[in-house]
Amino acid sequence: MIVRTLDECRNSERRIVSDNWESTRMLLKDDNMGFSFHITTIYEATETHIHYQNHLESVYCMSGEGEIEVVGGETYPIKPGTLYILDKHDEHYLRAYKYKEMVMACVFNPPITGAEVHDENGVYPLVD
């Protein structure tokens, strides 16, 4: 059994900070569960281009407000209780509204190793 708290993970190398977001990676590839689980905060008044070409992701909004715009498609509002699933490696823009940072629970398959950040194309590399 694996037991971890958000606080202990935040105070470790499992917390990754970027310009637009920070992510606490609570469950990673080396935990051998077949997926990874993160609590991610999207900073207020930001826009992040993301295109997970190597991963599928489901995201549940726990707090805050924003929107997700699928490139070449629709824009969907995000608020607490919203779940979105990137089941087609959807290229998108994630926006948190002003004064409304978003806190999200994220699940990735395949799992990430922990240190990944988006490259210039919004992609996480596939790491063995």
From Swiss-Prot:
CDD domains: cupin_EctC. Belongs to the ectoine synthase family. Pathway: Amine and polyamine biosynthesis; ectoine biosynthesis; L-ectoine from L-aspartate 4-semialdehyde: step 3/3. GO terms for biological process: ectoine biosynthetic process. Keywords: Lyase. GO terms for molecular function: ectoine synthase activity. It catalyses: (2S)-4-acetamido-2-aminobutanoate = L-ectoine + H2O. Its EC number is 4.2.1.108. InterPro entries: Ectoine_synth, RmlC-like_jellyroll, RmlC_Cupin_sf. HAMAP family: Ectoine_synth. Catalyzes the circularization of gamma-N-acetyl-alpha,gamma-diaminobutyric acid (ADABA) to ectoine (1,4,5,6-tetrahydro-2-methyl-4-pyrimidine carboxylic acid), which is an excellent osmoprotectant. Pfam families: Ectoine_synth (PF06339). The gene is ectC. This is L-ectoine synthase. Gene3D superfamilies: Jelly Rolls (2.60.120.10).
